[in-house]
Amino acid sequence: MQLWKGRFKKELSKTTNDFNSSIPFDSRMYREDIEGSIAHATMLGKCGIISEESSADIIEGLRGILADIESGALKIDMEAEDIHTFIEGELTKRIGDNGKRLHTSRSRNDQVALDVKLYLKKEVAAVKKLVVALIKVIADKAAQYSETVMPGYTHLQRAQPIVFGHHLLAYGEMLLRDVSRLDDCLRRMDEMPLGSCALAGTTYPIDRTITAELLGFDRITNNSLDGVSDRDFCIEFASVLSIIMVHLSRFSEEIIMWCSWDFKFVELDDAFSTGSSIMPQKKNPDIAELVRGKSGRVFGDTMTLLTVMKGIALAYNKDMQEDKEAIFDAVDTVKMCLTAFTPMLDTMRVIPENMRKAAAGGFINATDCADWLTKNGVPFRDAYKATGELVARCIELGTDLENLPLAEYKAVCDVFTEDVYNAISLEKCVSQRTAFGGPAPQLVKAQAQRVREIAEKL
């Protein structure tokens, strides 16, 4: 079935049909297309644009099509131009002329905008649910390891001691912001475009608010031209998905490092690891590596959407058909990554002794040494210089700050006393960092509980 016969004298060539068709990827929106059509038919009947009998006949027919697709009794014709054409054609086959009345005061331009919004509204909720599940795992693990000392890094160099729970909660905060972005994205997406028609609205006395309420939209679009031209909602959702993937990719990178024998901070469960075809000893963090790799795929989907839309004059152009494959792929990829990543993290075994051992090296407590001097009256820049000299002396002697003799300390600055050794112990370094947002164990426990409670309410 073609919806646009009449103007044309020739049949569409197979090449053109295959190239033009979107049903291989938009068929996933069959449910949304039918939901939108049921609401549209209901509105047409209530407004007297078609008879109540015709409206009821259409609705019954559409519900039958939906039931048959979902039961497998009806197969979607992959030779159809798109899912809208297939469903309208099937409806007309089943109920006759009333099926031809469905498209009154509607264009495929506003129909497809509606379908994509209906579909993506559900997907925003699905992604949010998966992100929240990951946040809960992070919060629980952070509470469990709120006293596990590890090195914090800058430039991938050991910098200052923290606790593992604090490190985990950094990702918890990132993901909480991602949830907020998803909510914002949904708020802007929640406008119903149906009634915009091709671009200039309609002469029929429709009531768009009826359709919006039936479909659960917060409001209707204000401008018919914008209603069919807009794909901001796809771009924004893809952008949020890209940011989520940035966070997952960074987390994956760290897990990959931590799993290596050079770190050995953690070990992934066998169920979330793979081996080598030639090296019997290997246990590879493939899930984390794939998440890291798939981030580029989602970024590419976002760039596809931006590039498709950047040069299109208003209103609809066929270029916009390319929006669906990109946004669908981005959604599918992120959902798959979250589905695999969360249980991988949940079952990951932490090795506290290796974290503690790593934190004991690299003069990670040097800042605390300088802070001790500052608290005892030495200007910070002088304290910084003195501590740097102590580190250099430790390197010469092959020792560390904890074991450097007090005489060496006093040779650099006579303010030093025995008390400095207590101040630079790793546990003391961490426990003293009690400023809000810091890694002191009691703060980390409280923050883990806060994040868990927030996640429970999302």
Predicted features by range, described:
Residues H40-I50, Y119, H166, I235-I243, ...:
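Short, well-ordered beta-strand elements within core beta-sheets of diverse protein domains
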Residues E53-S54, P151, T221, D382, ...:
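A generic structural-conservation signal
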Residues D57-E60, L225-D230, A386-L390, S425-K428:
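Short linear loop/turn motifs
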Residues M1-G36, D97-N98, M279-L458:
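Glycine-rich cofactor/substrate-binding loops
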Residues M1-G201, I206-E213, T274-G275, D286, ...:
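A helix-coil-helix interface module used to build multimeric assemblies
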Residues H40, G61, I65-D68, E90, ...:
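Generic, well-ordered alpha-helical scaffold segments in large soluble proteins
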Residues K128, A143, P151, Q157-G311, ...:
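Charged, flexible cofactor/metal-binding loops and thiol motifs
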